[in-house]
Amino acid sequence: MESRGKILMERYELGRLLGKGTFGKVHYARNLESNQSVAIKMMDKQQILKVGLSEQIRREITTMRLVAHKNIVQLHEVMATRNKIYFVMEYVKGGELFEKVAKRGKLTEVVAHKYFQQLISAVDYCHSRGVYHRDLKPENLLLDENENLKVSDFGLSALSESKRQDGLLHTTCGTPAYVAPEVISKIGYDGAKSDIWSCGVILFVLVAGYLPFQGPNLMEMYRKIQHGEFRCPGWFSRKLQKLLYKIMDPNPSTRISIQKIKESTWFRKGPEENRILKERTLNENTTKNVAPVLGVRRKKNAHEDVKPMSVTNLNAFEIISFSKGFDLSGMFIVKEWRNEARFTSDKSASTIISKLEDVAKALNLRVRKKDNGVVKMQGRKEGRNGVLQFDIEIFEVTTSYHIIEMKQTSGDSLEYRQLLEEGIRPALKDIVLA
């Protein structure tokens, strides 16, 4: 049914695969009656039910029907069969804004200004309808054939009716590098204020080519986010810097509002003419091999000298999250290319360590605890590529909220992933946030 050229429900001719995620895939398609090009997102019903995504899907449909804006990807219709759910959406042929940034290294302030105005217009519209996106990032921003911005992926959106009696949202969603400090803290938060923060991170990334908050691990990155620790590079205009510091204010009560953003000089007028010439020169001199968004880190005390380096791509997770955990919906995020896995838990550190020891015993693994919060596990016999070893590091965000990272250090990668999938993952299900 889903192969190229096949007819779907006597209405659409399916074409090439546009993308694939954890819970579905997107195909290009053509409406047989109108000849209109569309994108069809296909999701498996059984998988949705299995991982408890049915409420998430209902929310996405409701949200997309509430919003109709020129800078938001439109939902045309929803269809279903016994086994599948189909979202028929507007086809946006220009690709992801993320790809444009990754290819160029960074954008000029002039170009970023245009996209930011369109982003704020779309977000402001959503907020006026009681809808908060909660996962704004360059990968969720598409470009049409005229280079106009389109906001997509309302899978994490929260309606205003989702608020508790205190008027605040209480679920932790979004991609870690773009999420607001109050969301990380797991306290109630204003969905509009958290979206504004994410817009600020996006604007920074567009003009800088790298993230404002970076660290050797998630805990350090979260610390910087919570304290609003970032510096603007020298090529940012003063008015842009001033606006960014107001947007990425770690205190949501003093953070700038969308209305005030619209009234700011940089938003209304854009960068000054003399800065435009400077930015064009900088852009022309940017090498084609500049590392994309997260492949760059600033030197200490020399933030203008940016060099590419390989770091964990924290903003490329395939995340669909609406649980207490950041990015898992009760499951692991496994990054095969780095042989890493990550999950969250609301258990105490001692409970987590005790559980890990039980799992190691059941799987016939040796355990050695370290003083710096790292638990090392290793196999008891040689594998295909030596003895399998991996480190487990526990980060405390709050006393009742921990992030656990697992990294392979030696042995066969295939054996490691098999152990994760068949042994560790199911054994830890009772401590992973659901």
Curated annotation (Swiss-Prot):
Positions of the catalytic residues: 135
Segments of this protein annotated with the region PPI: 338-367
Enzyme Commission no: 2.7.11.1
Obligatory cofactor(s): Mn(2+)
Superkingdom of origin: Eukaryota
Keyword list, A-Z: ATP-binding, Kinase, Manganese, Nucleotide-binding, Serine/threonine-protein kinase, Transferase
Domain Protein kinase: 12-267
Induction context: By drought and salt stresses and abscisic acid (ABA).
InterPro entries: KA1/Ssp2_C, Kinase-like_dom_sf, NAF/FISL_domain, NAF_dom, Prot_kinase_dom, Protein_kinase_ATP_BS, Ser/Thr_kinase_AS
Residues reported to bind ATP: 18-26, 41
Coiled coil: none
Occurrences of domain NAF (ranges): 298-333
Activation loop: annotated span: 153-182
Catalytic activity: L-seryl-[protein] + ATP = O-phospho-L-seryl-[protein] + ADP + H(+); L-threonyl-[protein] + ATP = O-phospho-L-threonyl-[protein] + ADP + H(+)
UniProt record similarity statement: Belongs to the protein kinase superfamily. CAMK Ser/Thr protein kinase family. SNF1 subfamily.
Function according to Swiss-Prot or TrEMBL: Involved in salt stress tolerance. CIPK serine-threonine protein kinases interact with CBL proteins. Binding of a CBL protein to the regulatory NAF domain of CIPK protein lead to the activation of the kinase in a calcium-dependent manner.
Cited PANTHER family: CALCIUM/CALMODULIN-DEPENDENT PROTEIN KINASE KINASE-RELATED, CBL-INTERACTING PROTEIN KINASE 15
Domain notes: The activation loop within the kinase domain is the target of phosphorylation/activation by upstream protein kinases. The PPI motif mediates the interaction with the ABI (abscisic acid-insensitive) phosphatases.
Protein name as annotated: CBL-interacting protein kinase 15
Species for this entry: Oryza sativa subsp. japonica (Rice)
Gene from which this protein is expressed: CIPK15
